[in-house]
Amino acid sequence: MATIKVDVVSAEEQIFSGEAKFVALPGETGELGILPGHTPLITRIRPGAVRIEVEGGNDEFVFVAGGILEVQPGAVTVLADTAIRGKDLDAAKAEEARKRAEETLQNAKSDLDLAKAQSELATAMAQLEAIQRLAKIRSRH
């Protein structure tokens, strides 16, 4: 089966680099599915889970807190603001981040504080959702 080169990088490190049969991720206007030979595309990514279907059936999962997606016919590049490998996701930390963001939202004194708190809350909620999706998938295997 045809594959596509996939790179997922954050400001800190390269998270994934390899060949994949399929990539699914949260685009700005909805979920995107990328197959080998996909038409070129550049778009923003919302916070959420990136699923990389590799040969052999072991999918790779990465949580991204937003970023940019570039697709070329033979390559997919995810430039993430922040990225965490699926195996490194921590539900307790994500829940704590959600609580802090909700508290900050309640106490926001300016539009800037409000916007920052809303962004942090959206990221924490997306991370918790990604953790739940990953747990559901792992329980099936």
Swiss-Prot record:
> Which branch of life, at top level?
Bacteria
Q: Where is this chain's protein located in or outside the cell?
A: Cell inner membrane
Q: Which membrane topology term applies here?
A: Peripheral membrane protein
What the entry lists under Pfam families is as follows: ATP-synt_DE, ATP-synt_DE_N
Gene3D superfamilies tied to this protein = ATP synthase delta/epsilon subunit, C-terminal domain, F0F1 ATP synthase delta/epsilon subunit, N-terminal
Spell out the InterPro entries in the cross-references.
ATP_F1_dsu/esu_C_sf, ATP_synth_F1_dsu/esu, ATP_synth_F1_dsu/esu_N, ATP_synth_F1_esu_C, ATPsynth_dsu/esu_N
HAMAP family, sorted? ATP_synth_epsil_bac
The UniProt function text for this chain reads:
Produces ATP from ADP in the presence of a proton gradient across the membrane.
Q: What name has this protein been given in UniProt? A: ATP synthase epsilon chain
Q: Which organism is it from?
A: Burkholderia ambifaria (strain MC40-6)
